[in-house]
Amino acid sequence: MNKDEYIKILEKRVEEYEAAIADMTAPIIPSIIPQTILVPVTGLLMAERLEKITAKILNHIKEHDIEFAIIDFTDITVDRIEQMCLTELGEQIRNLTDSINLMGVKPYFVGMTPQLIKEIVLSGIELNAETHANFQAALKHLMKINSLVFRKI
């Protein structure tokens, strides 16, 4: 095998690893609440990653009967936002929100740190999504609006 062939093989392997990492850093998890998904976003945030996460969520919504999408930013702090100004981050999050809304699904954002919230507010971006402090609070809210209760058996 010559040098060019070897480079192509390595480039393909890198693409495969990047795809695997992207899947692991924003898995789509079905919730105990019917028609609800949880998407924990972890790792460094870049515009390209947010676009891929948005596409992944929209494809999942298209293929499944989803009413609520809980996007969990617990792992994301201002220092985990790479090469992207906070205005751009706000725009990407707004695009995610608008896209989910256009699919007929209600987005919920949870786990935003006070620092991240402050930066989004200062950027002037208006988010059209309900927010909760954490995943548990969002689940309690969804259980209430869906008249669901947990019972011991």
Predicted regions and their residues:
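Long, leucine- and charge-enriched amphipathic alpha-helices
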Residues: 1-27
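Conserved beta-strand segments of the P-loop GTPase G domain that flank and frequently precede/overlap
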Residues: 39-42, 70-74, 110
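STAS-typified acidic loop motif
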Residues: 27-55
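Amphipathic alpha-helical interaction surfaces in cytosolic regulatory modules
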Residues: 75-122
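A short, well-ordered alpha-helical element
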Residues: 47-69
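Non-catalytic signal-transmission and effector/linker regions of two-component phosphorelay proteins
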Residues: 146-153
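Short acidic-hydrophobic, aromatic-tinged amphipathic segments that line or gate anion-handling sites
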Residues: 128-138
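Alpha-helix N-cap and loop-to-helix initiation/capping positions
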Residues: 48-52, 84-91, 130
